[in-house]
């Protein structure tokens, strides 16, 4: 084929594909309704303009319930690119007797009228009658389908031609923020009801919510904290992030109108809440301490690990950068899981941390090198910062443990005894960097074999020399050994076993860094 013929063929394909694309129905705005408008902090009714990427299709949707013949609308509004909604001019639910009815369509305000197809009768509010389709509708439909197939083939042929011609296409860098991800399919079809605020933090608040018959946690970010929400969503979406000791991720959504937008992150809900909240109200036994500490260490070790060759891709090493007892959640059986990845940093092969700002996190838990602003921007340096903070969390656990023969302290945050509840950066620098102080390890803790081993582990986690700190994997192994050994130790053997284990049995410090 000559150059002129190729050019003519390309022009023909472009014109055909353009015609096909222009022929589809464009959705610019949809009818908006929210039955839970007060709790979701949105308008109840109105017209919602639909936003999205230029190369993505936009749709309208409606969800409703049929309660003994009475129609209750749950939500109406804009719906992001969904192949199940393509070329539907009418909003029709086709599933057989769903618990919550759902339909989507293309075209301005096409969700104003909706119906339920399998019942062969219109299921709708009386205020939104649906006009029956005339007989020639099916004829028109059968005529359009082949034409659409032909248009699709033409578009594919054009794409193949272009792909073959451009063997090395240029890398395109987005010129604008890609915006929130599309709603999770799991969430989009199900009503999500906010119940009560459980916590407030730096980047928003956490709600207990109901998703059909189960409770979930909804972390709501204001739009100005979009970067934190985006970072947390991206970390949860990495390959291999499903782990027993990492908080289970369910979905992410954008809620509200274009004027008042909130960003939602939906995760599993754990009634016991954070480790910090639990320790305020409860003391822990030696076995409970070991279980919490070991599962927390396992979660952090998995987060720190670089795992190639997973079924869904390569899991990079991840530094949390805000380890604290507030960001460790407890399941009903006291298994710990790591949460809150708004500041997390992933380390992909061949890439450095670059100009990442090092002095982030909660001041009270900042390592000496962070407080000094003297961070080596390499992977292992960031992982060791996490380990310093983990040492402080282990101290919090030890301070509320009943194992030692002595009084159990009231719950206090690390350094609260030294510098109070609201330390400044200068306060932390003075105590941690210049005076090299750490929270007090009580003398009577040393009289319990397990607590004595734990104290040594804590000291090696918060060592002033970052390179001397233990790895998370090493901490997990040590705690397993502590629990096993203390279950067989007698009172007379304490000194002998502590000496033996301290000198011989502990795994090497740098087992995974």
Swiss-Prot record:
Catalytic center residues: 322
A single cellular component GO annotation: receptor complex
InterPro entries: Activin_recp, Kinase-like_dom_sf, Prot_kinase_dom, Ser/Thr_kinase_AS, Snake_toxin-like_sf, TGFB_receptor
SS bond partners: 30-60, 50-78, 85-104, 91-103, 105-110
Keyword match Signal: yes
Keywords noted in UniProt: ATP-binding, Cell membrane, Disulfide bond, Glycoprotein, Kinase, Magnesium, Manganese, Membrane, Metal-binding, Nucleotide-binding, Receptor, Serine/threonine-protein kinase, Signal, Transferase, Transmembrane, Transmembrane helix
SUPFAM superfamilies per the UniProt record, alphabetical: Protein kinase-like (PK-like) (SSF56112), Snake toxin-like (SSF57302)
Domain (Protein kinase) ranges: 192-485
Catalytic EC class: transferase
Cytoplasmic compartment residues: 162-513
Stretches that traverse the bilayer: 136-161
GO biological process, one term: cellular response to BMP stimulus
Location(s) in or outside the cell: Cell membrane
Keyword rRNA processing among UniProt keywords: no
Family stated for the protein in its record: Belongs to the protein kinase superfamily. TKL Ser/Thr protein kinase family. TGFB receptor subfamily.
PANTHER family hit by this protein: ACTIVIN RECEPTOR TYPE-2A, TRANSFORMING GROWTH FACTOR-BETA RECEPTOR TYPE I AND II
Complex formation: Part of a complex consisting of MAGI2/ARIP1, ACVR2A, ACVR1B and SMAD3. Interacts with MAGI2/ARIP1. Interacts with type I receptor ACVR1. Interacts with BMP7. Interacts with TSC22D1/TSC-22. Interacts with activin A/INHBA.
Protein name: Activin receptor type-2A
Gene, per the UniProt record: ACVR2A
């Amino acid at each position: 084929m000559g150059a002129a013929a190729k050019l003519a063929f390309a022009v023909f394909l472009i014109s055909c594909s353009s015609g096909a694309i222009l022929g589809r129905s464009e959705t610019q705005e949809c009818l908006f309704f929210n039955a839970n408008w007060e709790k979701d902090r949105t308008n109840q009714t109105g017209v919602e303009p639909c936003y999205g990427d230029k190369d993505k299709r936009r749709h309208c949707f409606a969800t409703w319930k049929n309660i003994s013949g009475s129609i209750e609308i749950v939500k109406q509004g804009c719906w992001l690119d969904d192949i199940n909604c393509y070329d539907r001019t009418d909003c029709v639910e086709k599933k057989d007797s769903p618990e919550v009815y759902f339909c989507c369509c293309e075209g301005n305000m096409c969700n104003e009228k909706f119906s339920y197809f399998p019942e062969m009768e219109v299921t709708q509010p009386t205020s939104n009658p649906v006009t029956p389709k005339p007989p020639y509708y099916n004829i028109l439909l059968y005529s359009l389908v082949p034409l659409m197939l032909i248009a699709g083939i033409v578009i594919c042929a054009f794409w193949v031609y272009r792909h073959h011609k451009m063997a090395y296409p240029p890398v395109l860098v987005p010129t604008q923020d890609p915006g929130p991800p599309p709603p999770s399919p799991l969430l989009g079809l199900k009503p999500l009801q906010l119940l009560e605020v459980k916590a407030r933090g730096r980047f928003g608040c956490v709600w207990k919510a109901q998703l059909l018959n189960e409770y979930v946690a909804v972390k709501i970010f204001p739009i100005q904290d979009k970067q934190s929400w985006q970072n947390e969503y991206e970390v949860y979406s990495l390959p291999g992030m499903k782990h027993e000791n990492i908080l289970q991720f369910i979905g992410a959504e954008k809620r509200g109108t274009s004027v008042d937008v909130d960003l939602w992150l939906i995760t599993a809900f754990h009634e016991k809440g954070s480790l910090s909240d639990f320790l305020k109200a409860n003391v822990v036994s030696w076995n409970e301490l070991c279980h919490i500490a070991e599962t927390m260490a396992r979660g952090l070790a998995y987060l720190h690990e670089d795992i190639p060759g997973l079924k869904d891709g390569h899991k990079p090493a991840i530094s949390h950068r805000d380890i604290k007892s507030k960001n460790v959640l407890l399941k009903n059986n006291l298994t710990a899981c790591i949460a809150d990845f708004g500041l997390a940093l992933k380390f992909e092969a061949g890439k450095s941390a670059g100009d990442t700002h090092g002095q982030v996190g909660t001041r009270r838990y900042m390592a000496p090198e962070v407080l000094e602003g003297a961070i080596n921007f390499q992977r292992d340096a960031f992982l060791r910062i996490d380990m310093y903070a983990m040492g402080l969390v282990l101290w919090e656990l030890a301070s509320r443990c009943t194992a030692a023969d002595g009084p159990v302290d009231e719950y206090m945050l690390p350094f609260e005894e030294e510098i109070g509840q609201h330390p400044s950066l200068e306060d932390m620098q003075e105590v941690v960097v210049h005076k090299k102080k750490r929270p007090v390890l009580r003398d009577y803790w040393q009289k319990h074999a397990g607590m004595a081993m734990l104290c040594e582990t804590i000291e090696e986690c918060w060592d002033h020399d970052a390179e001397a700190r233990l790895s998370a994997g090493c901490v997990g192994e040590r705690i397993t050994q502590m629990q096993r050994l203390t279950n067989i130790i007698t009172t007379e053997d304490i000194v002998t076993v502590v000496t033996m284990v301290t000198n011989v049995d502990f795994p090497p410090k740098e087992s995974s860094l």
